[in-house]
Structure formats: structure tokens, C-alpha cells
């Protein structure tokens, strides 16, 4: 019981928080720049690009619960949730890059198909990584003050990543691009690759740093009214 309710080392909290920083390097990019990338780089019409994003959101509504169910049923010596954070880190970041990669297809219908498939797979991997990651924070300790501390540090990491994406994306695109405009495909690819490498390292650190100290059954018994 002392282990369950004990303090979580600061290094573990910071390591875990890097997972949210990684997620926001992806999430903020999708929210702010994905549509712009589709129209400026892929050359898709706004309505088509918007439809691609809408379809992905609909698919994601089914993927999220599936990710939660599968991670909850996982049983390994590392726990339920840590393995998913580590297992999905590489494919998650690979499809992050592919979602902002211009394959050089001239047929706009095929471009739309590529955009749809790559974005749906990216969103799916986001769910299979971030859903277990979020659940992991709830099993690191049974101490509510410690959970609040973990959440606070995680929020700071996410906010920093948000500012990085908002403040550095276009300058990096211009720096690495072969041309001078924000529509340069090489600039986008180089920028996203940098973010993806950083995100991969952060997720691996988060997965290996955090420790699952309590079982979900204990959470449900001790906190019957707790809402996620």
C-alpha cells in the first residue's frame, strides 16, 4: 500500500510528461497546418481536403474505444499501458511524416486517396498511443496529490510543445525549403521529420520512465465516482 500511495520521483513525472509533449507535436500540427498542407502542397480543393479530415474524424470515433479496450485487456510484465506507448511510438511517428509527405502524384483523385489513408492511419496510431498513455497516468500512483502533480507537469510539457509547433513550424519550413514559400514540400518534410524524431525519443522515454504501480481494479474500488 505504501508503494501505491507513495510519492512519484520527479524524474519519472518529467519523463512521463514528455509523452504529452510528443503527442502535441503531432496534434497541434494536425489541427493548425494539416488543411493548409493539403491545399498548398497537395493542391487539393478546400472542400475535398475538408472531407478527408472529416472522414478521419468519423473513423477515429470508432478507433478510440477500440484502443481503450485493447490496452485494458493487455497483460504484460510491464503492465497494461506502458507497452502500448513504446510499441506504437515508431509507427506513430512514421505516419506523422507520411501525412506531410508529398508523393509527387499528379492525379488529384489519387492524391486525395493518399491523403485520406495516411491521415486515417495517423489518427488511428494517435489513438493507440495516446489513449494508453493517458490511462498510464492514472496507475502511476494512488495518491491524489501526486496525480495532480503529474497532470500539472504533463500540462506544462504539452503547452511547451504547442508553442513550439505554433512558433517554429513556418520558419523551419522556410529555412529547409528549396523555394521561399510555405508551400515548399521539402521544407515541410524536413520540419516534420525533425518533430517526429523528437517525438519518438520523447515517447520512448515516457514509456520507460513511468511505472504502473496499481491495477485498474483498485482504482475502480477506491474511486467509484471518478470520471475520466
Where are these regions (language model features)?
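Membrane-embedded alpha-helical bundles of multi-pass transporters/translocases
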Residues: 2-218, 222, 226
Amino acid at each position: 500500500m505504501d508503494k501505491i500511495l507513495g510519492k512519484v520521483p520527479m524524474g519519472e513525472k518529467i519523463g512521463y510528461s514528455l509523452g504529452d509533449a510528443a503527442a502535441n507535436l503531432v496534434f497541434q500540427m494536425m489541427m493548425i497546418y494539416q488543411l493548409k498542407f493539403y491545399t498548398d502542397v497537395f493542391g487539393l480543393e478546400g472542400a475535398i481536403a475538408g472531407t478527408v479530415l472529416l472522414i478521419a474524424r468519423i473513423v477515429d470515433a470508432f478507433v478510440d474505444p477500440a484502443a481503450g479496450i485493447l490496452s485494458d485487456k493487455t497483460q504484460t510484465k510491464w503492465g497494461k499501458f506502458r507497452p502500448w506507448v513504446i510499441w506504437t511510438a515508431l509507427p506513430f511517428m512514421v505516419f506523422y511524416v507520411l501525412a506531410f509527405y508529398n508523393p509527387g502524384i499528379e492525379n488529384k483523385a489519387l492524391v486525395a486517396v493518399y491523403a485520406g489513408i495516411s491521415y486515417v492511419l495517423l489518427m488511428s496510431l494517435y489513438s493507440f498511443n495516446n489513449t494508453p498513455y493517458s490511462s498510464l497516468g492514472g496507475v502511476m500512483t494512488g495518491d491524489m496529490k501526486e496525480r495532480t502533480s503529474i497532470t500539472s507537469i504533463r500540462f506544462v510539457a504539452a503547452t511547451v510543445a504547442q508553442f513550439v509547433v505554433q512558433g517554429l513550424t513556418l520558419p523551419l519550413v522556410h529555412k529547409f525549403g528549396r523555394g521561399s514559400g510555405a508551400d515548399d514540400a521539402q521544407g515541410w518534410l524536413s520540419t516534420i521529420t525533425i518533430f517526429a524524431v523528437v517525438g519518438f525519443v520523447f515517447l520512448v522515454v515516457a514509456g520507460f520512465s513511468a511505472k504502473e504501480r496499481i491495477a485498474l481494479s483498485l482504482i475502480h474500488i477506491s474511486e467509484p465516482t471518478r470520471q475520466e
